[in-house]
Amino acid sequence: MAKGYGQKRAGLLLFFGSLCWAQFSSAQLSRAQNDARAIFEEIGKDLGELTEITGLKIRHKVPFDLITKNQVNQFLKDRVHDATTPEDLRIEELGLKKFGFVPQNFDLAKTTVDLLTEQAAAFYDYHKKKLYITDWAPSGMRQAALVHELAHALADQQFHLERFIKQGRDDDDLSMARTAVMEGQATWLMSEAIERRAGQSLTGSAKSVEMMSRAMESGGSEYPVFDSAPLYFRRTLVFPYTQGMLFQNAVCEKLDQDAFTQVFRQPPVSTQQVLHPQKYFDAVMPTRPALPKFSSRGYKRLVAGTVGEMDHAILIEQFLDERRAGELAPHWRGGLYALDENKRERRVVLSYAVEWDDAESARQYFAAYQEVLRKKWRNIEVVSSGDGTFAGRGDDGYFVVRLEGAVVSSLEGLRDPAVN
């Protein structure tokens, strides 16, 4: 969950360029007869169609290459090696494990590379400004993936996607929101192109967009790596595509063709704005609740970042249920976290605070987070419960959770009891 490493939310995806992931059942997959000339002709036609839809101009040709599954896997491994360090990986894993999003034996790099290799249909590398098409994709998938990735190439020529993503890398939740802009627009344009070829359009058809979004959310269910991945990874992989598409559609309904420029020039600043576009239009900004303090002598700050509405929805769904996540998470107003490490003692402390839109929502989350702690740890001893405090000892040390007005805060992994 470290800022600067995968910007947390989409895992390593942001370092790899933009990937169009498979949304087709295994029965549809057969080895494609890839014809470079046919692909070249498709690229020209698709770019022309995208220009007509968006009003964005093509500045130069988009180079492309065919790539095998093994080459995709190696490409992703190389990108991990080039873009991260072992310490980056360790910190990222620590954050995910401290919140309970992944098990203690989780291998972040391997899981992400395997997951993206399994899902890839095509990807646009905005470092090299080049489109890669997988050689195992059938013609139907290839055609859709081409439009998706060419939408990225067109946006890159206007807005410099690598810079766009890097500008948000110091804020975890904002980074995911920007990824949703990038992937959501490409997914919307891919879907609109398909609709137009059938004589239809997404314009003015919010229900069709919602149906497509739900279909994509369930489209990875036949892939074993995806199926076995932690909920956090399954949700964060599809969020930029599904929720990003719905967000782009909402902006299109309000601004028409100007929407394709607007979302890049004035992007959403949180996953909440993506999930609730009216909050984007109203410029509702996330708050920054103060983190709880502890005696940090001998500790080094590893990382600090944001924890957004999307994260809280996943956390509540994982440890409680989806219904409660849907009811409570939208009341999120802002969240922060930090990890501090004492290497001599091999101890990592999680500091965490989240603000809600009213005291009642905070009270509900205070109760919900107690359930989260009871379920994420194998052993828990509660020494204080009530009057806005929940404290005791868990698997990794002492903890204390406090409710103060509309803010819930937590310290976890402490050496000494927080409440006597």
Where are these regions (language model features)?
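Auxiliary, metal-adjacent structural segments of Zn-dependent hydrolase domains
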Residues: E41-G140
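Post-HExxH zinc-binding segment in Zn-dependent metallohydrolases
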Residues: D46, Q157-E162, K166-A215
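Bacterial N-terminal signal peptides
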Residues: G11-Q23
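Pan-zinc metallopeptidase signature
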Residues: G220-V348, A353
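Short pre-active-site segment immediately N-terminal to the catalytic Zn-binding motif
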Residues: L131-V147, L174-R178
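Acidic helix-start/capping segments at beta-turn-to-alpha-helix junctions
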Residues: R59-R79, D170-D173, G204-R214, Q266-V269
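C-terminal soluble interaction/assembly domains
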Residues: G335-L336, D340-N420
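Active-site recognition of the HExxH zinc-binding catalytic motif
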Residues: L50, A144-L161, A186-T187
